[in-house]
A protein has these predicted regions:
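Canonical Rossmann dinucleotide-binding motif of NAD(H)/NADP(H)-dependent dehydrogenases/reductases
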Residues: 2-41
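Conserved Rossmann-like nucleotide-binding pocket used by diverse enzymes
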Residues: 9, 35, 58-60, 87
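Generic recognition of short, well-ordered alpha-helical segments
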Residues: 21-22, 48, 72
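Short, solvent-exposed amphipathic alpha-helical segments in soluble enzyme
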Residues: 24-28, 51-52, 76
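Short, charged/polar "capping" segments at the starts of alpha-helices
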Residues: 41-47
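Rossmann-fold cofactor-recognition segment
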Residues: 50-68
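Rossmann-fold scaffold of SDR-type NAD(P)-dependent oxidoreductases
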Residues: 61-62, 82-91
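Conserved Rossmann-fold cofactor-binding substructure of NAD(P)-dependent oxidoreductases
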Residues: 65-80
Length: 91
């Protein structure tokens, strides 16, 4: 398990055909804790998509173009899962 105890944020988990979904699946299979983000209508889609991967994935609201949302998401992620070891922005 090469990613054991690593925490990775993945954006863009919307469908099981996305690069983000495939990356999250591989990361989980290799021991990582995955957190995800979404915004607007995509937030609900992301919440549904991650359930197909794991019930343990936390989803945070974040639009990368909204600095206030980014700052809030960073704070919430740090509070709930600690420091991240990696980020994949796959939108």
């Amino acid at each position: 398990m090469i990613l054991k105890d690593k925490k990775i944020l993945i954006t863009g988990i919307l469908t099981d055909k996305s690069i983000a979904f495939a990356t999250a699946k591989i990361a989980i299979e290799n021991g990582a804790t995955v957190v995800a983000t979404g915004f607007g209508k995509g937030l609900r889609i992301t919440e549904r998509a991650v359930k197909r991967l794991s019930e343990d994935i936390k989803v945070f609201e974040m639009d990368i173009e909204n600095l206030n949302q980014v700052n809030e998401a960073v704070k919430n992620i740090e509070d709930e899962v600690g420091n991240l070891d990696g980020i994949l922005h796959a939108i």
